[in-house]
Regions:
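Conserved small/polar residues in nucleotide/adenosyl-binding loops
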Residues: 151-153
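Short beta-strand segments enriched in small/hydrophobic residues
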Residues: 33-43
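Glycine-rich phosphate/diphosphate-binding loops that line cofactor/substrate pockets in enzymes
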Residues: 25-33, 85-90
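Short, solvent-exposed amphipathic alpha-helices that sit
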Residues: 22, 49-61
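A structural motif shared across PLP-dependent enzymes of the aminotransferase-like
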Residues: 15, 44-52
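Phosphate/diphosphate ligand-binding glycine-rich loop within oxidoreductases
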Residues: 62-64, 68-139
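Positively charged, low-complexity intrinsically disordered leader regions
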Residues: 2-28
C-alpha cells in the first residue's frame, strides 16, 4: 500500500471556501445569517486560542460570531442561565461552551442544558445517542474532520 501525505491545511482551506459559499447561499436565498455563540469561563490559555480562532473562522465564513467570556468565579447557575439565554436567542444557531470549565461546575449538567439542535459539539445525550445508535445525527467536529480528510485521500 502506497503512503500518501495529507495536506490538512490545504484541505481545511478548500473546506472553508465551500462553507463560505454555503453561508452566502443561505443569506441570499433564505435571508439567514448563521450565528455561533461561544462561551468561555476562565482564562485557560489553550482555550483562549481555540475560542479566538473559532471566532475568526466563523466571521471569515460570513457567519455571526458571539463570544461570551465569563470570569473563573462565575457560578454554575450563572453559566446555565447564559446557556438558556442563548437557547432562546433566534440569532444563535449553534452554542459551544468551551471545556474544560472550572472545577466548581459540572460539565455534564452544562452539556445537557444546551438544546440538542444548537449543540455544535454533539455532546448532548440526544446527539451522542443518535451517533451511538448508528442513526443520522450531528457528528462532533474533530472526528468528523478526521474522517472527512481520510476519506478524501
Amino acid at each position: 500500500m502506497a503512503t500518501s501525505i495529507i495536506d490538512g491545511k490545504d484541505y481545511a482551506s478548500r473546506l472553508r471556501g465551500k462553507l463560505k459559499i454555503a453561508v452566502n447561499d443561505l443569506k441570499e436565498k433564505h435571508k439567514i445569517v448563521p450565528g455561533l455563540a461561544v462561551v468561555l469561563v476562565g482564562n485557560d490559555p489553550a482555550s483562549e486560542i481555540y475560542v479566538r480562532n473559532k471566532g475568526i473562522q466563523t466571521k471569515e465564513a460570513g457567519m455571526n460570531s458571539f463570544e461570551y467570556r465569563l470570569p473563573e468565579n462565575t457560578s454554575e447557575d450563572d453559566l446555565l442561565a447564559k446557556v438558556e439565554e442563548l437557547n432562546t436567542d433566534k440569532s444563535v444557531n449553534g452554542i459551544l461552551v468551551q471545556f474544560p470549565v472550572p472545577k466548581h461546575m459540572e460539565q455534564q449538567k452544562i452539556i445537557e442544558r444546551i438544546l440538542p439542535s444548537k449543540d455544535v459539539d454533539g455532546l448532548h445525550p440526544v446527539n451522542s445517542g443518535y451517533l451511538a445508535s448508528g442513526l443520522k445525527g450531528l457528528v462532533p467536529c474533530t472526528p468528523q474532520g478526521a474522517s472527512s480528510v481520510s476519506y478524501t485521500h
